[in-house]
Amino acid sequence: LQSIPAGFFDGLTGADSFNKTFNGCTSLKTIPEKLFAKNVNATTMQSCFQNCTALQAVPAGLFGTTTKTKTLTSMFSDCSSLATIAADAFSGVNAASGTMMNIFLNCTSLKEVPSGLFKNNAKVTNYNYAFKGCTGLEKVGPEIFNCANGATSINGVFTDCTSLKEIGDNIFLNPEK
C-alpha cells in the first residue's frame, strides 16, 4: 500500500477508534487531506501511522471538526521519512482533554515544525516527548502549543533533537492569561 484513497473512511461516521490502523505499513508514502474529516465520533488514533517509514508528509486538514478525538499518542512516531507537516493538520481536534504524547517521536527526516501547529488544540493536556528523537529537526515556528486550558505535561518535548537551531517566540501560547 503506497497511498490511501481520498474518502477512504467517509462511510465510518460511527467509528470511535483508529488505533494502529496503518501501523507498520512501510510502503505507505501519502495520505489524503481530510482523511478523518467525517469521523466525528473518533476518540482515539493511537499509533495510527506508527512505523510508516516511507510516509513523507502529514496533509492539510487531516481532521474535520472532531470534538471527541482525545488520544493521538504515537500517531506518527517512527515515521523516518516524514519531512513536512501541514500547519493546519490538527486544527479540528478539540476534545475535552487529550494527549499528543510521542506524536512525532523519532521522525528523523522532519526539518521544521510549522508555526501554530497545535494552536487550535487548547484542550490538549499532554505533549510529553512530542518531538523526541527528531534528529533532523532544525526549526520550530512560533505559537506551536496552545496551553490555554492548562497543558500539564510537556516533558522532553525536544529531547534528542540534536540539529535544533531555532525556536520561535511564544511556542507555549496561552492567549487567556
Region spans (language model):
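Solvent-exposed loop and capping/linker segments of extracellular ligand-binding repeat ectodomains
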Residues: 1-177
